[in-house]
Each structure stands twice: as structure tokens, then as C-alpha cells.
Regions:
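Short linear motifs in low-complexity, proline-biased tails and propeptides
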Residues: 156-165
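Hydrophobic packing positions characteristic
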Residues: 2-156
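Glycine-rich ThDP/TPP pyrophosphate-binding loop and its adjacent helix/strand module
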Residues: 168
């Protein structure tokens, strides 16, 4: 092998040893809220060993004063990539669930956004409905039939037939 080829192979090998491409499993150590851009302090043992990294977000929609904001919490699993493969520039690009951690409302035709506290936005294509659900029971459901407001004590339904009120209620008190 000539010297030029050998040098090139050494450079490629060194580049490979010092750069990390692809996704790596990380764990959120802390959500950093001071700069208002969604940075996370993360642990990525396969790359950073026992040193934490500060990861910037990669989100599907963002701009001045608008965008999709869903910041993972402490101990959540996050997928980490590194800008241009540089381990000093981590990017969190998504999250992963451990076994049994996925919200129970989800499925192939059910899109769900659930907070840690149990507040849920559920979009069910099979039922053709959208609902906001509170973990203590109240909900608002929109469907092609109308709108339903529900609590443990009462249900109000607004549809093409009018308004119905069911439950232990007093109107006009």
C-alpha cells in the first residue's frame, strides 16, 4: 500500500474514532429552562461515558414565538444524535419508551398526547372523534354527532337535535 493511501486510511480511522453518527439512547438528567429553547442535560453512556451533555432540541415545527413544545422530563428516555458527529454538540431528536411505558390510549388509529399528570388529548380516527380528558374524569369530546361535556355528575350534549342535560344537576340556581 502506498503512503498516500495509508495516510488517507489513518485519517478516516481517526475521523471514525472521534465522531459519532446515528442515534444513541440517552436519559434526561434535567430539563434546562433558563434559555427557553428546550435544552436538556442528558446522560449518553455509549458516547459520553459518565459525563453529562447539554442537548439542543430538534423539533418538527419551530419559529419566533410559535412551534410544537413538548419537553421530556427527568428520567425520560431520549434519542440523541451529535451535530456533524461531534460529541460536544448533542441534539435530542425524540424519545423512547421502556417496556410498559406507552400511554394506554394509543394505537395505530388513535393519536394521543398525554402529560405526566394524566391530562390527555386523544384523536381517534376509528370513532372520528377528538377528546380532551382530565385524569379525574371530566372530558370534552367533539365528534361528527356534536360536542359532549362530561363529569362524574352530569353530561351536557350539544348536537343537531339541540342540547341535552343528564345527571344530578340544577339549572338556574
Amino acid at each position: 500500500m502506498d503512503t498516500q493511501t495509508e495516510t488517507l486510511l489513518q485519517e478516516i480511522a481517526e475521523e471514525r474514532r472521534s465522531h459519532y453518527f446515528g442515534k444513541y439512547r440517552g436519559i434526561v438528567l434535567e430539563a434546562l429552562t433558563g434559555d427557553d429553547i428546550g435544552k436538556l442535560k442528558v446522560s449518553v453512556p455509549d458516547v459520553l461515558q459518565d459525563q453529562p451533555g447539554i442537548a439542543v432540541p430538534c423539533v418538527p415545527f419551530a419559529g419566533p414565538s410559535h412551534g410544537l413544545v413538548a419537553i421530556p422530563e427527568k428520567d425520560d428516555g431520549v434519542w440523541i444524535e451529535f451535530e456533524a458527529g461531534d460529541p460536544s454538540q448533542p441534539i435530542w431528536v425524540g424519545c423512547w419508551w421502556g417496556t410498559g411505558d406507552m400511554p394506554s390510549q394509543a394505537g395505530p388509529k388513535i393519536r394521543t398526547f398525554v402529560t405526566t399528570g394524566g391530562l390527555a388529548l386523544v384523536m381517534d380516527d376509528d370513532k372520528n372523534e377528538l377528546s380532551l380528558q382530565h385524569p379525574d374524569g371530566p372530558s370534552i369530546t367533539l365528534s361528527s354527532d356534536g360536542i359532549k361535556l362530561s363529569t362524574d355528575a352530569a353530561t351536557v350534549t350539544l348536537n343537531t337535535q339541540g342540547i341535552s342535560l343528564q345527571g344530578n344537576t340544577a339549572v338556574g340556581e
